[in-house]
Amino acid sequence: MTKIVRSKYKASRRLGVSLWGDSKDAFNTRNYRPGQHGQNTMIKTSDYGLHLKAKQRLKCHYGRVTEKQFRNIFALAQKMKGNTGENFIGLLESRLDTVVYRMNIAPTIFAARQLVSHGHIKLNGKKADIASIRLKEGDVIEVKESVKQIPLIQESVSKQAQTTPGYLSFDVPSLTGKYLRVPALSDVPYPFEAEVHLVIELYSR
């Protein structure tokens, strides 16, 4: 886990934003790229580079989502009725690991994925161990009784009252939450500007 933490903080510096809004993020004190030439502000970024960086920021925010998975989610969003960008965000935000993270059951998207993959989360009363499961409105998730008291979960949920977004509900005493609705882009608490329009332009080329 330490290796993942170091790697994610390095990603924040490489991409020029705090990807998860973590107070421990090295980007907060060293807001330049890692490496010998990291503080060189004269390096120009091409139009393609700007589009690529917007995609990398969004993809990294969702943890270990592969490029193939990310593209497939985008392709599905294109086929759906309505705005492609809003559909894309709605699909990303309906993933089980994302919802566990947004409810602050886990402190990071990486820890959320581990809780799911280790079988510690229930979906509608049944064990769910696939991070990419897509939730529907009204779905209920809950932490398994056997792990409710572990420090990682208890420390994380202690912060939930201030930060649970409006498209989710969460009850701290029972560690049970509900997916209320598909969020709009403006509902999602990104700690950086999510330039979804640039991602759409990149994948539409």
Curated annotation (Swiss-Prot):
Keyword Membrane annotated: no
Keywords for the protein's UniProt record, in alphabetical order: Ribonucleoprotein, Ribosomal protein, RNA-binding, rRNA-binding
Residues annotated as transmembrane: none
Stored InterPro entries: Ribosomal_uS4, Ribosomal_uS4_bac-type, Ribosomal_uS4_CS, Ribosomal_uS4_N, S4_RNA-bd, S4_RNA-bd_sf
Pfam families per UniProt: Ribosomal_S4, S4
GO cellular component: small ribosomal subunit
PROSITE patterns the UniProt entry points to: RIBOSOMAL_S4, S4
Residues of the S4 RNA-binding domain: 94-157
GO molecular function: rRNA binding; structural constituent of ribosome
Record-level GO BP terms: ribosomal small subunit biogenesis; translation
Role: One of the primary rRNA binding proteins, it binds directly to 16S rRNA where it nucleates assembly of the body of the 30S subunit. With S5 and S12 plays an important role in translational accuracy.
Family per record: Belongs to the universal ribosomal protein uS4 family.
Subunit structure: Part of the 30S ribosomal subunit. Contacts protein S5. The interaction surface between S4 and S5 is involved in control of translational fidelity.
Name recorded for this polypeptide: Small ribosomal subunit protein uS4
